[in-house]
């Protein structure tokens, strides 16, 4: 599984070469960001049997066009970026978000800021 932000440095961090080095019949899961995985290379790897399948909550091109290989392969599951929509969102994430909004309204950086280095640019 992938758990990283998308940057220009890691775009297509999983491409044909990386997939070729994976164990045969592995399953790739991406819930992070579209663009981390080369969707064309992934579709080809699943179609060829190199990978058993994939679970994608994000893809490079959203929305995918009808008939796209990621949508037509039965061994690939694509969800509309709702993989994080679990039952605890109301109990954990919403209060965290509310606290960050109050912090920002007071003129401070949110506690959970992940890109602080870019805020002063």
Mark where each language-model region is.
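Rossmann-like adenosine-cofactor binding region
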Residues: 1-69
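C-terminal helix-to-coil terminal segments
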Residues: 60-121
């Amino acid at each position: 599984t992938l758990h990283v932000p998308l940057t220009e440095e890691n775009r297509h961090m999983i491409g044909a070469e990386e997939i070729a080095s994976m164990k045969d019949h592995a399953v790739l899961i991406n819930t992070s960001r579209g663009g981390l995985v080369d969707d064309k290379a992934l579709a080809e790897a699943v179609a060829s049997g190199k990978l058993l399948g994939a679970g994608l909550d994000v893809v490079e091109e959203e929305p995918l066009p009808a008939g796209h290989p990621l949508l037509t392969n039965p061994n690939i599951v694509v969800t509309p970026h709702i993989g994080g929509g679990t039952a605890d969102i109301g109990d954990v994430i919403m209060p965290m978000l509310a606290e960050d909004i109050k912090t920002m309204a007071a003129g401070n950086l949110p506690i959970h800021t992940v890109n602080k280095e870019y805020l002063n640019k």
